[in-house]
Amino acid sequence: MATLTPRQQQIFDLIRNTIRRTGFPPTRAEIAAEFGFSSPNAAEEHLRALARKGVIELTPGASRGIRLKVSRSDSELPDQFSLPMAGVLQLTLPLVGRVAAGSPILAAEHIDRQYQVDASVFDERPDYLLRVRGLSMRDAGILDGDLLAVRRASEAANGKIVVARLGDDVTVKRLQRRGGHIELIAENPDFTNIIVEPGEEFSLEGIAVGLIRSSGF
């Protein structure tokens, strides 16, 4: 196990705790603000040091592209991307693959398999997992093939990452209400935001409450 400096351990703990609390890693700016660094570049230097020591993995170009590779605690509990251990409370959740146009998201034909996860890694209990397709949410740390933990909901606060149905399509985006309009924000500048036009068929399928990094499942 790599030896971390006290500051590196503090940053590692912040990353781990932020993921456990929100389901997503912090940005460089958030790390800098937490520790009083003069700029996000200082946070980046610490992150690169942690990556060199093999305890995290960085995704280039993604503001939240931080993945825990090991857990560092007295009891050596697994991080939130690990398979569940025996003796801990487990949830069995349906894993949703591709969603056919116009059909319910949890229709039997959409369920790839049942997936067991450690319940303790989520502050809010999810109802299902959705396999992410594409890189439109890359800068939120959500990558192609990842499993997004989703709590079913028909309403969500501004800024929440949601699973939305727009016409026959289902998409993962950040919800933003501007005046009387709804906008679905991509977390990748290569993708265009979606503006929900008045009268367009739109509904929320759920709110993201966590993430499981893809490991070939």
Swiss-Prot record:
Disulfide bonds, paired cysteine numbers: none
Enzyme Commission number: 3.4.21.88
Residues the record marks as active site: S136 (for autocatalytic cleavage activity), K173 (for autocatalytic cleavage activity)
Enzyme class: hydrolase
Catalytically driven reaction(s): Hydrolysis of Ala-|-Gly bond in repressor LexA
DNA repair is among the record's keywords: yes
Single annotated GO MF: serine-type endopeptidase activity
Site (Cleavage): A101, G102
Function: Represses a number of genes involved in the response to DNA damage (SOS response), including recA and lexA. In the presence of single-stranded DNA, RecA interacts with LexA causing an autocatalytic cleavage which disrupts the DNA-binding part of LexA, leading to derepression of the SOS regulon and eventually DNA repair.
Family: Belongs to the peptidase S24 family.
Protein name: LexA repressor
Organism (species): Cupriavidus taiwanensis (strain DSM 17343 / BCRC 17206 / CCUG 44338 / CIP 107171 / LMG 19424 / R1)
